From Swiss-Prot:
This is Probable rubredoxin HupI. Residues 15-66 form the Rubredoxin-like domain. GO terms for molecular function: electron transfer activity; iron ion binding. It comes from the Bacteria. Pfam families: Rubredoxin.
Amino acid sequence: MSAFENFGKRETVSDDRMECGICWHVYDPAEGDPVWQIPPGTPFSNLTEDWRCPNCDALQSKFMRLGDGR
C-alpha cells in the first residue's frame, strides 16, 4: 500500500472546486464546463464517467480537491 494511495480522495461536497494534477486546470461547479457543455451548478461528482479534463484529456481520477480558500 502506497502512502499516496488515498491522496486527494477525500469526500467532496457539491461546491468543491477540483484541480487537474497534470495541467492544473480547475473545474469549478459554479462555472461548469463549456467545452463539454456542462451547465453551471453541476458538481464534479455528477459529471458523466466519460468526462475528461478539457485542457489535457486527463481522467477524473487525476483531479484533486482544492482547499476551501477561494
